[in-house]
Amino acid sequence: MAKIQRVTEANLPTEFGMFRIVGFEFPDTKKEHVALVLGEVENTDEPILARIHSECLTGDALYSLKCDCGFQLAAALRQISQEGRGVLIYHREEGRGIGLINKIRAYSLQDKGMDTIEANLALGFAADERNFEVCADIFALLGINKVRLLTNNPNKIDTMKKAGINIVERVALNVGENRYNTEYLDTKAKKMGHFIIHNQQKYPLECPYCSEEVPVQEK
């Protein structure tokens, strides 16, 4: 497969500030990824605050409480804005790489009692089908080598390091836990090794789209 290429960019005003949106595309498959860039990030010796955020239509756009994705997206952009410089790679691997319709099929199995890993396996997929190596290529195309990575996922860190990206710090991103996703977060911690911190008061649930507060389940 040919390497991904940087193909276009434009200004993108957001509630977190004026970002540049940079488009990337594989020349053979036309599969697309994007990055949101704030400030000067290219070819500097200073580590850049960055987030690899995998696409989640239900969490990012439809305000789902079944995961923490939408909360992580907003929190990452807010932290980058506060820092005044940084990058968010929007990694277009919906449903941990199984696609939107299969993710809904997995949700249906979860409604019947399976956890997020069991549901993927029952559908014939691995627990995580995502390819993070492309994100290392995107960092390189953006002129970024040293990264402070906003993540709870050790696999992202390992993949970036193996690809030659210097991860100088892991920045925790524990936000959005609620009664609908606490078991999901537990599963990611126990079965996937994610660094999950439950029910921290410094990370209160922010749910401006809910008609009432969604209480955090007590442990």
From Swiss-Prot:
Q: Which GO terms describe its cellular component?
A: cytosol
Q: How is the cofactor bound?
A: Binds 1 zinc ion per subunit.
Return the Pfam families for the record: GTP_cyclohydro2
Per UniProt, the keywords (alphabetical) are: GTP-binding, Hydrolase, Metal-binding, Nucleotide-binding, Riboflavin biosynthesis, Zinc
EC numbers, comma separated: 3.5.4.25
- Pathway noted in the entry: Cofactor biosynthesis; riboflavin biosynthesis; 5-amino-6-(D-ribitylamino)uracil from GTP: step 1/4
Q: Which residues bind Zn(2+)?
A: C56, C67, C69
Which reaction(s) does the protein catalyse, per the Swiss-Prot or TrEMBL entry?
GTP + 4 H2O = 2,5-diamino-6-hydroxy-4-(5-phosphoribosylamino)-pyrimidine + formate + 2 phosphate + 3 H(+)
User: Is the keyword GTP-binding in the record?
Assistant: yes
Q: Which GO terms describe its molecular function?
A: GTP binding; GTP cyclohydrolase II activity; zinc ion binding
PANTHER family assigned: 3,4-DIHYDROXY-2-BUTANONE 4-PHOSPHATE SYNTHASE, GTP CYCLOHYDROLASE II-RELATED
Similarity comment: family membership:
Belongs to the GTP cyclohydrolase II family.
Reported function: Catalyzes the conversion of GTP to 2,5-diamino-6-ribosylamino-4(3H)-pyrimidinone 5'-phosphate (DARP), formate and pyrophosphate.
Q: What is this protein called?
A: GTP cyclohydrolase-2
This chain's source organism reads: Pasteurella multocida (strain Pm70)
